[in-house]
UniProtKB/Swiss-Prot annotation:
One of its GO terms (biological process) is translation. It comes from Pseudomonas entomophila (strain L48). Keywords: Ribonucleoprotein, Ribosomal protein. GO terms for cellular component: cytoplasm; small ribosomal subunit. It comes from the Bacteria. This is Small ribosomal subunit protein bS16. GO terms for molecular function: structural constituent of ribosome. Pfam families: Ribosomal_S16. Belongs to the bacterial ribosomal protein bS16 family. The lineage of its organism: Bacteria, Pseudomonadati, Pseudomonadota, Gammaproteobacteria, Pseudomonadales.
Length: 83
């Protein structure tokens, strides 16, 4: 099954996540089909906290991709910010 989920990056104590489209059987930070955005939970000031390529996310959801629980929350947040 194809999922949209977070892949962790950054360094120790400074997490940074990429929103990736991947096969659910692949490792968390392993091979992916496409990166569709990023999430920086410790962004402050003028730094961008969340960036989502809404067009590509809509495409993958129409193809049957399932977002993880956290990604579903982030997509709602991004849609709310865009409106």
């Amino acid at each position: 099954m194809v999922t949209i989920r977070l892949a962790r990056g950054g360094s120790k104590k400074r997490p940074f996540y990429h929103l990736t489209v991947t096969n659910s059987r692949n490792a968390r930070d392993g091979r992916f089909v496409e990166r569709v955005g990023f999430f920086n939970p410790i962004a402050s000031g003028a730094e961008v906290k969340l960036s989502v390529n809404q067009e590509r996310v809509t495409y993958w959801l129409s193809q049957g991709a399932q977002p993880s629980e956290r990604v579903a929350q982030l997509l709602k947040e991004a849609a709310k910010a865009a409106a």
